[in-house]
Amino acid sequence: MTMVYANIFLAFITSLMGLLMYRSHLMSSLLCLEGMMLSLFVMMTVTILNNHFTLASMTPIILLVFAACEAALGLSLLVMVSNTYGTDYVQNLNLLQC
């Protein structure tokens, strides 16, 4: 495993650990998800370029489209929750609370 792959893998693991540890605020969860998507995009792009996979060259762009949709939905949910409750706590998203 080259140093580039190791650094990208460490970036993904760091974002995943941040997502698992800092779950109280929605904004920090969204930032960790964006870090995971960025590291996946870079890993896919480097792998496709190194192995000369011409058929899979559209895959990173499709991943970026899904990441943009995820970011837009997450930010709209953040605005809705912060306008409704005044905070961005993830516990406000629980529908079973009264």
UniProtKB/Swiss-Prot annotation:
Subcellular location: Mitochondrion inner membrane
Reaction(s) the record says it catalyses: a ubiquinone + NADH + 5 H(+)(in) = a ubiquinol + NAD(+) + 4 H(+)(out)
Keywords annotated in UniProt: Electron transport, Membrane, Mitochondrion, Mitochondrion inner membrane, NAD, Respiratory chain, Translocase, Transmembrane, Transmembrane helix, Transport, Ubiquinone
Pfam family, one: Oxidored_q2
Gene3D superfamilies from the UniProt entry: 1.10.287.3510
Gene Ontology MF: a single term: NADH dehydrogenase (ubiquinone) activity
Record GO biological process: ATP synthesis coupled electron transport
Keyword presence, Translocase: yes
EC number assigned by the record: 7.1.1.2
Bilayer disposition of the protein: Multi-pass membrane protein
Primary residence: mitochondrion
GO CC terms: mitochondrial inner membrane; respiratory chain complex I
Keyword Membrane (UniProt): yes
Source species, domain of life: Eukaryota
Transmembrane segments annotated in the record for this chain: 1-21, 29-49, 61-81
Subunit structure: Core subunit of respiratory chain NADH dehydrogenase (Complex I) which is composed of 45 different subunits.
Protein family membership: Belongs to the complex I subunit 4L family.
Protein's job: Core subunit of the mitochondrial membrane respiratory chain NADH dehydrogenase (Complex I) which catalyzes electron transfer from NADH through the respiratory chain, using ubiquinone as an electron acceptor. Part of the enzyme membrane arm which is embedded in the lipid bilayer and involved in proton translocation.
Full protein name: NADH-ubiquinone oxidoreductase chain 4L
Native source species: Leptonychotes weddellii (Weddell seal)
Source taxonomy: Eukaryota, Metazoa, Chordata, Craniata, Vertebrata
